[in-house]
């Protein structure tokens, strides 16, 4: 991403410019589903 203004013109600390792309066309899942079987991972079960 290239800023439109020169860095010397930003002032004291500068401005934070962020671009966010939001789409409602999402076919995937946010979290993968599956089973992990490992002795290295501790089992944490609370009542």
Curated annotation (Swiss-Prot):
Question: From which domain of life does this come?
Answer: Eukaryota
Q: What is this protein identified as?
A: Putative heat shock protein HSP90
Mind telling me which Pfam families this protein's record contains? HSP90
Species name for this entry?
Populus euphratica
Name the keywords, alphabetized.
Answer: ATP-binding, Chaperone, Cytoplasm, Nucleotide-binding, Stress response
Protein role: Putative molecular chaperone that may promote the maturation, structural maintenance and proper regulation of specific target proteins.
| GO cellular component terms given for this protein | cytoplasm
Primary place of residence?
A: cytoplasm
């Amino acid at each position: 991403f290239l800023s439109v203004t020169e860095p010397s013109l930003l002032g004291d600390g500068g401005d934070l410019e962020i671009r966010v792309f939001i789409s409602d066309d999402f076919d995937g899942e946010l979290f993968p589903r599956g089973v992990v079987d490992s002795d290295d991972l501790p089992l944490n079960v609370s009542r």
